[in-house]
Swiss-Prot record:
Gene giving rise to this polypeptide: purB
UniProt keyword annotation of Lyase present: yes
Function of the molecule: Catalyzes two reactions in de novo purine nucleotide biosynthesis. Catalyzes the breakdown of 5-aminoimidazole- (N-succinylocarboxamide) ribotide (SAICAR or 2-[5-amino-1-(5-phospho-beta-D-ribosyl)imidazole-4-carboxamido]succinate) to 5-aminoimidazole-4-carboxamide ribotide (AICAR or 5-amino-1-(5-phospho-beta-D-ribosyl)imidazole-4-carboxamide) and fumarate, and of adenylosuccinate (ADS or N(6)-(1,2-dicarboxyethyl)-AMP) to adenosine monophosphate (AMP) and fumarate.
SMART domains, A to Z: ADSL_C
Protein name: Adenylosuccinate lyase
UniProt cross-references to InterPro entries, sorted A to Z: AdenyloSucc_lyase_C, Fumarase/histidase_N, Fumarate_lyase_CS, Fumarate_lyase_fam, Fumarate_lyase_N, L-Aspartase-like, Pur_lyase
GO biological process: 'de novo' AMP biosynthetic process; 'de novo' IMP biosynthetic process
Reactions it catalyzes: N(6)-(1,2-dicarboxyethyl)-AMP = fumarate + AMP; (2S)-2-[5-amino-1-(5-phospho-beta-D-ribosyl)imidazole-4-carboxamido]succinate = 5-amino-1-(5-phospho-beta-D-ribosyl)imidazole-4-carboxamide + fumarate
Length: 431
């Protein structure tokens, strides 16, 4: 993983020492289960726990000879625990240890992500309420549409992230399965009771039908969920990038004292953090494809998934954690320019109220086509002049026959577009 995007506590979860500690935790859970079932002598687990040490360099040195990391680990621990080594890794295959340990890591990573995502939700909710009644222009196709509330825009982000909390909870549940079922998953050399007890100690459930491995659809679901969360963050980042354009300048991401925007142009304040989030979201999607490829392994298992997972598990979880933490800081500290929002609403000289005029003319008895033609005719004049849309309407003979000056002016009241904002917030809170 690129150190630039690695943050504690997530990065600490994926160190070599942490990996071997999880392996040892799985092995000890198995010996404890054997003990409790009376299948090995009492005291074995405690002695192994006291004598086994995580020696990364020793394991790597042995692996140079064995070319097998789990064998190197078993031999390394075996050299430390004397006679008890005959009960260590008893009846197991490498994937019993690897897959179960990976589940422990992914569950723990998921919990870290979940906690940070909930904090992000809290920030989004606070910002949404702060700007609940702040008018801003809504844009469709990048073009001014109708006024809306900036708080409502942020509420949409919050709503999506709340759904992502639920998705992530489901993804954690999806990978909360281990397997202690032997070489092809049929418990030939390790009884199911050992698996049940060992996994219960670890807080995991037995994979209902395993092969030599836990089926990889679980991991694909998990990584796909992480990519969906990242895409939601990207949506927020892209919106902020658009709103920070010089011509728009309604929102700006945080810009620290002493920060530089360009090596050549001192005036620049670029949305580099949101651009970074956009790029990292692309990487998150890239992790999904190989995880889907991992589902179709040969027969009861091949090892093609292993090299993929050494990359994607640590990288995807660390990348998303960085994205969530960074996005939280951006939204918490972004500058919201309410005056610029008002100025931008006025930029099109009242054209954003065209639908209200259309509906008023229909209300007065015109067909939709007749009303549309009148409104569009005056709107197109406005596009190409400095006059306000209302002025053209007040001069239009067809309009004057149907609508009074007071009625027309009332149609340009911006509060009309915010009248149901409180209802939307209240409805959302009830869900």
């Amino acid at each position: 993983m690129v150190e630039r995007y690695s943050l504690s506590p997530m990065k600490d979860l994926w160190t070599e020492e942490a990996k071997y500690r999880r392996w040892l935790e799985v092995e000890l859970a198995v010996t404890r289960a054997y003990e409790e079932l009376g299948m090995i002598p009492k005291g074995v687990t405690e002695r192994i726990r006291n004598n086994a040490k995580i020696d990364v360099e020793l394991f790597k040195k042995i692996e140079e000879k064995t070319n097998h990391d789990v064998v190197a680990f078993v031999e390394g621990i075996g050299s430390m625990i004397g006679e008890d080594s005959r009960f260590f890794h008893y009846g197991l295959t490498s994937s019993d240890v690897l897959d179960t340990a990976n589940s422990l890591a992914l569950v723990e990573a998921g919990k870290i992500l979940l906690e940070s995502l909930k904090e992000f939700c809290d920030v989004l909710w606070e910002v949404a309420n702060r700007y609940k009644h702040t008018p801003t222009i809504g844009r469709t196709h990048g073009v001014h549409a109708e006024p809306t509330s900036f708080g409502l825009k942020v509420l949409g982000w919050y709503s999506e992230m709340k759904r992502n909390v639920q998705r992530l909870e489901r993804a954690i549940e999806e990978v909360s399965y281990g397997k202690i079922s032997g070489a092809v998953g049929n418990y030939a050399n390790v009884p199911p009771e050992v698996e049940e007890k060992a996994l219960s100690y670890l807080g995991l459930k037995p994979e209902p039908v395993s092969t030599q491995v836990v089926p990889r659809d679980r991991h694909a679901f998990y990584l796909s969920t992480l990519a969906i969360v990242a895409a939601g963050i990207e949506r927020i980042a892209v919106e902020i990038r658009h709103l920070q354009r010089t011509e728009v300048l309604e929102v700006e991401e945080p810009f620290r004292k002493g920060q530089r925007g360009s090596s050549a142009m001192p005036h620049k304040k670029n949305p580099i953090t949101c651009e970074r989030l956009t790029g990292l979201s692309r990487m998150m999607r890239a992790y999904v494809d190989p995880s889907l490829e991992n589902i179709a392994l040969w027969h009861e298992r091949d090892i093609s998934h292993s090299s993929v997972e050494r990359y994607v598990f640590p990288d995807a979880t660390q990348t998303l954690y960085y994205m969530i933490v960074t996005a939280t800081n951006v939204v918490r500290n972004m500058k919201v320019n309410e005056e610029r929002m008002k100025k931008n609403i006025d930029l099109t000289k009242g054209l954003v109220f065209s639908q209200r005029v259309l509906l008023k003319l229909i209300e007065k008895g015109l067909t939709r086509k007749e009303a549309y033609d009148i409104v569009q005719r005056n709107a197109l004049k406005t596009w190409n002049s400095e006059k306000h849309f209302l002025e053209y309407l007040l001069e239009d003979e067809e309009v004057k026959k149907l609508v009074t000056k007071e009625e027309l002016e009332e149609l340009f009241d911006i509060s009309y577009y915010l009248k149901h904002v409180d209802h939307i917030f209240e409805r959302f809170e009830k869900e």
